[in-house]
Structure formats: C-alpha cells, structure tokens
C-alpha cells in the first residue's frame, strides 16, 4: 500500500490526537447496503492500529424501500423528507436495524463497536407544518460517544434526534454529521461513497482541493453540476468553522486506509489550505523560515551563499512556509526564456495534504515552460513523471521538462542540468 515510513508518519500524527478528535466517518445508506464487508474491514483495521473513528450513518435507500412497502409515498420539501407519525415509526425501525447490522458486522469482524441510536442529538422541530416530525439539531451530547471511546469501542450513531420532552425526530444525516463535527472539531471528516471521490469533467478523480487557492476557479467550471456544487459549498462552510489542520476526505470504504495512511491517498482530499505567496525577489520573503523549510524537506543543508548566488525569477510559498517552489532565470535560447525549477520543498507534516500540489498548480498557471532535475531515488519522481512532457536519465539525475518546443531547447536544458552545481550539502 505504501512505505512503512509513510504509514508510521501518519499513525504517529493520528495517535497524538485526543481520541474523539481523530475522525468522524459519515456512511451513507447505499454503502451500508452495497459495501458492508469493505466498510467493516476498513473500520476494523483502524481499531487494530489503535485508532477509533466515530461513525454516523444514514439509511436513505433502506428507508425508501420500507416506506414504499408500507404504502407511504415519499414526499420531500427543499430536499428534506417529510415525516408523518406513521412514517416516523418506520424511520426508527429502519435506523435501528441498519445500526445493528453495522455493529454486528463489526463485532463479527473482531472489532469492538457500540450501538448508539439516541441520546446524542437534542433537536427542535424544523417546521412542523411543513416537514412534520423532522428535527433541527440544537445541541450535541457527547457523553454516549465518550463512554464508547473510553471503552475502546467504535461508536456507531444514528441521526435520530430528540426534543427536551422526549419526542423522537427525524434528522437529516448530513446535517447531523455537520453538527457533530462542529462539536468534536476532528482532524479528519470522512465521507464514504460509492464513487470514491469528486469527479472532474472527464470523470476522473480529483485527488485534492485546496480551497484557499482553488475554490473560486473550481466553482466557475461549467461541469460543476448542482449536486457537486452544493457538496463543495457545504464542505467549505464546514471547514471554515474548523481548525486549519482539519480536512475532508471522500473515498470508498475499501480505500479508506490508503486515503488515511499514504501521501498519494485514494479519493478526494479537501482542505481549507493556505494562501500562496508570490515573490520576485528574496527581500520579499522570510529567508530564515524558507531556509528551514528547504533544509527540513530535503534533510540537508543549503550552501551558505545560496540566496546571494541564486538568481530568483519567482518563488511561490504557502503562507505558513510549509511548501515552496523556487524558479530561477537561466537566460534565453532564441526567443524563449529558460526557467529552471531549483527547489520544490514540502514539510513532512504537510505531506499528503495536497498543499505541495496547490503551490505547484499556482506556479504552473503562469509558467508555460519549465525544466528541472531530480535524484534517481527521489520519491517525488512519480509526481514529476505525471507533470512532465518528457524525461532523460543521466548518471546522477533525471531531467524533466514540460512545454519545451523543440529538440534544441531540450538538448540545451539537459546539458545545463548535467553541469549545474548542487546547492545542498550532505
């Protein structure tokens, strides 16, 4: 799945969190129905490595089937299911059955799990005349969840709410998840779906979204349809009210471990992210912080005269100095400027966040041609292969490029890389 170093890095990061701040996992009813085995396997694995997720589930398809069988026509207003007293009895039955099905499947898989079908969401009527017995969450009681976590058991929660007087109300599972997340402030919010993530215009998976740099551009795309638009808006609203380190992952149950424990992931990772600073001179940057970023990222020391001897063209640095791209001006060849990628640095604790890609994407938008070199054992080479138009292997280096127009340019850039002096010691 990944290197032992990667897995260990993420496990250490997650293990340092308070138990209830690790992850809230939202499971749709379709996943419970169609992918229960993969779901229980992934959740059990997390428990095996010492992590206990908090699981909240829906039961939409199951509820549709039971209501239809009872002769109750589905009625929605503003996307919310209108719930009559007769329907509520079926809602309770279906939620409890779905909850127990997941809890029993986890227990059969060797995991410890606790069924929590009430006592978490205190609610009031959303609008009784319009929606019937549908609730709006007013308070979240963490006591049942904390008791489960203290016992080392996965809390499995339904989205049923209760009024202070004890009336059960049907609460939309997405709304319940949002309120739970606001109360817990978790490091990870995970939506498990059949699609495994958000898809672009060509049906390809979007691996990461940095909202600070990509949200406005993304929302202008014609292929962002109504459902996806609402989902992205909801995620942004959610993350805007959480700590900067919190993130949303959308993935398949079978890919949950890969999404959590590898830099590459397997789904769509959405973060509020950081703004990307753009500089054209070293004076515009905090050089001690930039030095620390570069040296920490590469595990080596910059040569003492690096900044005085390096002719900066542009630098792109995340606002908290956790990722940076440094470009240098290597003169002209004919009518074309030669731009060299001198450094691409990402701190270990930012690996897997999509922050490096966000900085790279900002750079690439205004850099139509680029060349660079990388050591043969550099783990980033997989990314470089995907981003480049070509690669030539030298004795010590791989030379990458994109946007170069002819063989003369490529030949010149390859020769430059062969003789360029290293700027990192050790």
Swiss-Prot record:
Residues the record marks as site: Transition state stabilizer: 26, 231
Any GO CC annotation of this UniProt entry: cytoplasm
Pfam families for the chain: AA_kinase, NAT
Protein origin, superkingdom: Bacteria
Compartment(s): Cytoplasm
Catalytic class of the enzyme: transferase
Name of the protein: Acetylglutamate kinase
Presence of the UniProt keyword Cell wall biogenesis/degradation in the record: no
Positions of the UniProt region annotated as Unknown: 253-426
């Amino acid at each position: 799945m990944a290197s032992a170093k990667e897995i260990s890095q993420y496990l250490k990061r997650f293990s340092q969190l308070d138990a209830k701040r690790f992850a809230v996992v939202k499971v749709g009813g379709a996943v419970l129905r169609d992918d229960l085995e993969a779901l229980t396997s992934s959740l059990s694995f997390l428990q095996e490595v010492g992590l206990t997720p908090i699981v909240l589930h829906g039961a939409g398809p199951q509820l549709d089937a039971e209501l239809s069988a009872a002769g109750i026509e589905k009625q929605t207003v503003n996307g919310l299911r209108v719930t009559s007293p007769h329907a509520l009895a079926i809602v309770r039955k279906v939620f409890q059955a779905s909850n127990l099905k997941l809890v029993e499947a986890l227990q059969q898989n060797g995991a410890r799990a606790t069924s929590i079908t009430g006592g978490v969401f205190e609610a009031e009527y959303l609008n009784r005349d319009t929606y019937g017995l549908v609730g709006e969450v007013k308070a979240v009681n963490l006591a049942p969840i904390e008791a489960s976590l203290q016992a080392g058991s996965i809390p499995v929660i339904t989205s049923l709410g209760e009024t202070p007087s004890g009336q059960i109300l049907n609460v939309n599972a997405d709304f319940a998840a949002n309120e739970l997340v606001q109360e817990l402030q978790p490091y990870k919010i995970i939506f498990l779906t059949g699609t495994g993530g958000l898809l672009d215009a060509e049906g390809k998976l979007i691996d990461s979204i940095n909202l600070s740099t990509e949200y406005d551009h993304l929302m202008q795309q014609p292929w962002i349809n109504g459902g996806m638009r609402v989902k992205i808006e909801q995620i942004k609203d959610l993350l805007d009210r959480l700590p900067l380190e919190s993130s949303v992952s959308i993935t398949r149950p079978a890919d949950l471990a890969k999404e959590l424990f590898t830099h590459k992931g397997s789904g769509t990772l959405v973060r509020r992210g950081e703004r990307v600073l753009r500089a054209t001179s070293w004076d515009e940057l905090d050089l001690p912080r930039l030095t620390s970023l570069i040296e920490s990222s590469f595990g080596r020391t910059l040569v003492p005269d690096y900044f005085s001897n390096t002719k900066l063209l542009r630098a792109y640095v995340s606002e908290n100095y956790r990722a940076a791209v440094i470009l240098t001006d290597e003169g002209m060849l004919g009518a074309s400027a030669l731009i060299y990628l001198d450094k691409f640095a990402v701190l270990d604790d930012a690996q897997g966040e999509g922050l490096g890609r966000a900085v790279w994407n900002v750079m690439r938008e205004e850099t139509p041609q680029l060349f660079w070199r990388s050591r043969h054992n550099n783990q980033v080479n997989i990314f470089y292969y995907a981003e480049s138009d070509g690669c030539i292997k030298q004795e010590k280096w791989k030379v990458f490029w994109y946007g170069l127009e002819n063989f003369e340019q490529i030949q010149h850039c390859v020769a430059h890389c062969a003789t360029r002096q290293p700027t990192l010691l050790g």
